[in-house]
Amino acid sequence: MPKFLHTADWQMGRAFTRFETEDGAALVEARFEAIEKLAQLANEHQCDAVLVAGDVFDAQTVSDRTIRRVFNATKAFTGPWVMLPGNHDAALAESVWTRAERLGAVPENVHLALQPGVIDLEPQRLSILCAPLTQRHTYGDLTEPFSSYESPEGFP
């Protein structure tokens, strides 16, 4: 039975303007520490993959530094990470995700689901059906295309 660590809504890059400056800065740092802790937990529990189901980033306009720090924080777990864009960080033609790729910030073990489809994790013999948000607001069933998909050869 596959073992996943499932998480979502990190909202990295969020500004905590309702708090005192020091407290806001501490909350920002705590979010990066939380990603590091998730990586540690994935190792401790021998997870097959970490699934991040939307809103890794709070906005398309986060800094390059924030983008790099997010992906650096994942490095302790060398197994696959699958990240799906959400409504805050939708997979637009030009997005925080395409910027992360241009920056070379995305490690090889991190799979970005920037369009609907299947991500095959061959060493783990897993296929992940991904339905990312490709626009900020959507009203249709993002999983509808999956009904016609067939399992890849050699996968259950």
Where do the PLM segments sit?
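His/Asp/Glu-rich metal-coordinating catalytic cores
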Residues: 49, 60-156
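N-terminal active-site segment of His-dependent metallophosphoesterases
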Residues: 1-69
